[in-house]
Amino acid sequence: MFNLLPAFSLGVLLIVMEGRGSAVNTPASRPVTRKSKSYGRSCVEAPSYFWQTPGHLTVLKVPTSRGAAKSQIITNKVDPEHIALLVKNEWKLSYVTPLHHFRHTQLKSYAKHLSAFIVAEKQQGVAVEVGLDAGFKVTFTAVLGLAETDEDAETVFIQIQSKPVFAAAADAPKVVWRGWLTCVNGDPEYLRSLPPDFVSLPLFCTSGPESLTNLVKSWFERAFDCNFGSLALNSSTLNWLAALWTGCHPACNIRYLKLSWSLPTEPPLDVLYTVNPQDAWELWNSIHPQENTDDRIDIKDVQAFMSGMETHFFRHFKIHLSAGTLLKVSTALGSAHHDGKIKIGNSDYITTLLALLTECALLKMPT
């Protein structure tokens, strides 16, 4: 790490790359905005593609401001064992359109159907994972307490267990896949516009073999007439996370702020920019003072924060980071990558992260 004027510490790594390439209720019934056709939901039926037009289409706008990140002891309202399942792991993100006739009261039934579906697909020759037994145990669990509004549906956590082929009879099955669907502070106008037989859990996070992820998605699409898509995180989203997490430093030491850029040079140039957390916060505080009574953060504040760091970097290295693509942001609170991978490092700020990702998922869905 270099001590550079003006009172701003950073570490820089430049890499030149050559040739790289339960008994839970779903949200209360909402006003029906139009009549919907009834579609089957058997796990063996082809999807009806009703997901393309689930009720009146609401134009979702990208917010230009949002509330500052606030710490909350999430374990006061969410089972600590459930929270432990969400933190520390790396999750791959997808969006999913509203689920037709999904019911939180039917989770045990869904677990049985998904387990049978995976076994049937494997027996038909679908590659699952080398070394796994033919039997799979699937569990669906409602994670109560993450929902922030009456319109938010409760989070659903899915876990798949299996035994290795040569495991002893007494050996316990091992967890081979995890995933969860969530909605935190979803756009209320959009959620209210959905017909009453739809549930929106737009953010899908997975950890495990891609083959199992694909099977789980396939089952959901057949069972609930929904559709999945990849969820990449653009530079604007990463900028927001950098600013929101930096603003948390006085209350919770973020330990570091690491930013990774890719620059379109020949050969390509990767830049890892590590900023002292106190210096990053002082820059942020000069733009959005801590004593400000308005806890709303404007996009202009975020842009000024990132511009300040880019300007400081250029002053010393004569490299325009703004010409490249921001790929990753990480602090002790969590990390997020451009390709749609996240890690939750601190549960006290999980609501801020999930609210932003829920927004990204809703904006990415087809209209």
Curated annotation (Swiss-Prot):
Organism domain of life: Eukaryota
The keyword Nucleus is assigned to this record: yes
GO cellular component entries: chromosome, centromeric region; nucleus
Keywords, sorted A to Z: Centromere, Chromosome, Nucleus
Presence of keyword Heme: no
UniProt subcellular location: Nucleus; Chromosome, Centromere
Principal cellular location given in the protein's record: nucleus
Function recorded in the entry: Probable component of a centromeric complex involved in assembly of kinetochore proteins, mitotic progression and chromosome segregation.
PANTHER family (alphabetical): CENTROMERE PROTEIN L
Family: Belongs to the CENP-L/IML3 family.
Protein name stated in the entry: Centromere protein L
Species for this entry: Danio rerio
Gene: cenpl
